[in-house]
From Swiss-Prot:
PANTHER family: 3-KETOACYL-COA THIOLASE FADA, 3-KETOACYL-COA THIOLASE, PEROXISOMAL. It holds the Pfam family Thiolase_C. This is 3-ketoacyl-CoA thiolase. It is an enzyme of class 2 (transferase). Heterotetramer of two alpha chains (FadB) and two beta chains (FadA). It comes from Escherichia coli O6:H1 (strain CFT073 / ATCC 700928 / UPEC).
């Protein structure tokens, strides 16, 4: 079986969805920009030698519809002979895109793929066109379709207080801002064209979603966003709304070596699981455990974790049940997470994996794990190993 390696990984800055940097930039353009950038950064690989493009996107309508993967590839002037497919596993879409490409390479059906994802939540809102079948309520609580209420449920089940949530959210912003100031994101962010507040076209090379002024005291003043009577989850402890894309160059180890491209890491194992939709945010726990089992590892073997921060009330129970509460500041989301950077749905799996690879190199650790919860009750995880 072929060894699957990550040769390169990049992302756009994360733009605010409401009047942000990418308010006049389409999702296809964000995607095409990264496709072109990956190929330009790795000239030893001819674009025509790509076997496929796997691109995650959740709201596949309007500008994100009609196979955005192919549309973006055409905009990027990837040769017409290279196919492309859009992948949808809701929040896990671009990580699923990685898994799909990895399996193609493992079986010998592909040697080189572009992988990534995008979501422009300013242009195509998360709830646009949603129409759940009324019969679902016979088997699943109606609130399972309301992500904020699933986070409230997890908080109550696991004893996650409002104070714990506020502290974690403040940490996310502080860590993300520190990473920005120190240049920790420089190796992953590709400057991307957008418009500033005055409408002037400029290149953005930083995440505009981060709020460095965030404090626990300020967060404590916010009202519950989803359960106004007894809730603890606020807008400040939820992932921000943002627009962005992320991309990876994934190859067989043999092809990378033949081309003189240095692999950054290999895919050690992959897992996806289902869980109760009413606590959809718990999915990373069984997914991570299964991925670790497949890799022959334990949580203690992992040097760095990237766990998508859908809500502070969601990620804290996952950290707790993976036995990592005492290691948060040493291993978990060291550059902040989606509470500060936002969670562009189809982008996030590739985004957290990209950040993870850079952290693994900076911290000089052998193993890293990226995982995320998925709406309606799923979890997805990937174990990476440096090579």
């Amino acid at each position: 079986m072929e060894q699957v390696v990550i040769v390169d990984a990049i992302r756009t800055p994360m733009g605010r969805s409401k009047g942000g940097a990418f308010r006049n930039v389409r999702a296809e353009d964000l995607s095409a920009h990264l496709m072109r950038s990956l190929l330009a950064r790795n000239p030893a690989l001819e674009a025509a030698a790509l076997d496929d493009i796997y691109w995650g996107c959740v709201q596949q309508t309007l500008e994100q519809g009609f196979n955005i993967a192919r549309n973006a590839a055409l905009l990027a002037e990837v040769p017409h002979s290279v196919p492309a497919v859009t992948v949808n596993r809701l929040c896990g879409s671009s990580m699923q895109a990685l898994h799909d490409a990895a399996r193609m390479i493992m079986t010998g059906d592909a040697q080189a793929c572009l992988v990534g994802g995008v979501e422009h939540m300013g242009h195509v809102p998360m709830s646009h066109g949603v129409d759940f079948h009324p019969g679902l309520s016979r088997n699943v609580a109606k609130a399972a379709g309301m992500m904020g209420l699933t986070a409230e449920m997890l908080a109550r089940m696991h004893g996650i207080s409002r104070e714990m949530q506020d502290a974690f959210a403040a940490r996310s912003h502080a860590r993300a801002w520190a990473a920005t100031q120190s240049g920790a994101f420089k190796n992953e962010i590709i400057p991307t064209g957008g418009h500033d507040a005055d409408g002037v076209l400029k290149q953005f090379n930083y995440d505009e979603v981060i709020r460095p002024e965030t404090t626990v005291e300020a967060l404590a003043t916010l009202r519950p966003a989803f359960d106004p009577v007894s809730g603890t989850v606020t807008a400040g402890t939820s992932s921000a709304l943002s627009d962005g894309a992320a991309a990876m160059l994934v190859m067989s180890e043999s092809r990378a070596r033949d081309l003189g491209l240095k692999p950054r890491a290999c895919v050690r194992s992959m897992a996806v699981v289902g869980c109760d939709p009413s606590i959809m945010g718990y999915g990373p726990v069984p997914a991570s455990k299964l991925a670790l089992k497949k890799a022959g590892l334990s949580a203690s073997d992992i040097g760095v974790f990237e766990m998508n921060e859908a809500f502070a009330a969601q990620i804290l129970p996952c950290i707790k049940d993976l036995g990592l509460m005492e290691q948060i500041d040493e291993k978990i989301n060291l550059n902040g997470g989606a509470i500060a950077l936002g969670h562009p749905l189809g982008c996030s799996g590739a985004r957290i994996s990209t950040t993870l690879l850079n952290l693994m190199e900076r911290k000089d650790v052998q193993f890293g794990l990226a995982t995320m919860c998925i709406g309606l009750g799923q979890g997805i995880a990937t174990v990476f190993e440096r090579v």
